[in-house]
Design a protein with these regions (language model features):
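Alpha-helical transmembrane bundles and membrane-interface segments of multipass inner-membrane proteins
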Residues: 1-195
């Protein structure tokens, strides 16, 4: 008995202009060892920087105290039981669960698509590192230490900054990928006609 014919969609527009079955193309997008090392290094550096700065602020400034740095910028020791920038401060348990789910989802996404773009380990490393650092504080302490204060925005910390920068990098990468005429396309993309 002969094996049923397999249906392969193919992708065109690669650097070799060759055709490859989708199964191979998708497999090659998964994160390899180098991507995982880069992601881990960036995430760990983000956690270390955030935890160190929180420790310095907590040990040098009493809760509620502040130090003027420059212009509208202050170092102001406050506690936050919510997510970034003080939002959802009354729902600590929900925030812990949602943060854990978000980090797990990002790791699964990276495992499947980590080689899709060279900037992904940087962007996701920042987001995962920032999220993990704040998550550790919420689980251990029930709150996070915020200290960066611009007066016109709720106080935040380095972890919040890493999350925002990582998300902005991801968005910029997505926008660039959509506008890049050299990006790989599927056969259906190449033959589609505007209606």
């Amino acid at each position: 008995m002969t094996e049923p014919a397999r249906r392969f969609d193919v992708r065109v527009g690669s650097s070799t202009d060759g055709l490859a079955p989708v199964s191979f193309a998708e497999r090659s997008l998964g994160a390899g060892p180098l991507q995982w090392v880069a992601l881990a290094a960036i995430a760990l550096a983000a956690v270390a920087a955030d935890q160190l700065t929180k420790h310095i602020v907590s040990s040098q400034l009493a809760l509620g105290d502040g130090v003027h740095v420059l212009g509208p910028f202050w170092i102001h020791h406050v506690r936050n039981s919510g997510i970034a920038f003080g939002f959802f401060s009354q729902a600590t348990a929900v925030v812990i669960v949602l943060t854990g789910l978000a980090v797990a989802w990002m790791l699964v996404y990276f495992a499947r698509s980590g080689a899709r773009h060279p900037i992904l380990p940087v962007a996701l490393g920042l987001v995962i590192g920032g999220s993990t650092s704040n998550l550790l504080d919420r689980v251990r302490l029930g709150y996070v230490t915020d200290f960066l204060d611009l007066r016109w925005w709720p106080s935040f910390n380095l972890a919040d900054s890493f999350i925002v920068v990582g998300v902005l990098i991801l968005l910029a990468t997505l926008v660039y990928a959509e506008r890049d005429p050299r990006r790989p396309r599927t056969i259906s993309d190449a033959t589609a006609r505007p209606s």
